[in-house]
Amino acid sequence: MAMQYDVKSVHMSASGVAVGYRTRLKGVLMSPSESQTLNVAFCDNISVSGTYDVPGSTVCTVTIANHGLSNGDRVYLNFTSGSSSDNTFTVSNVATSTFTVAVASATTNGNVTMYADILVELDCSSTTAFYTMIPGEGILAEQGIYVGLPSATVTTTLFYG
């Protein structure tokens, strides 16, 4: 196999679309600046929108029609209104148009965008930067790559091509 010369990189310091077209995720450099446990999600850039409600508890009910999830699935939720914090969550209590996730205790509701196709989820818990190489040809991202950064205390550089 010949050397691949078309690998590119992009640096992300906030959640958003890193690459807006079909590509392969080749590697990730994580650079946390604080010692706290964070989950960073690298998702296929396919999202669906819905609403959420946290009625004074730690249970967040998300309503998205025909979401296609099962109990135990992992999703990245971007809360676009209200006061819940964006993060990666484990899905439970799945019904046709609803599911729940565990969140910090709150009373809030609003709109949410869900990324259900997580390509890679990386955890960091110290201030030591680290690189994760994706073996083989990388992971195919059919619609591009969305990066979910749950805090401003971690940045990332993606390598793709």
Where are these regions (language model features)?
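Surface-exposed, low-hydrophobicity beta-strand/loop segments enriched in small/polar/acidic residues
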Residues: 1-49, 74, 90-95, 102, ...
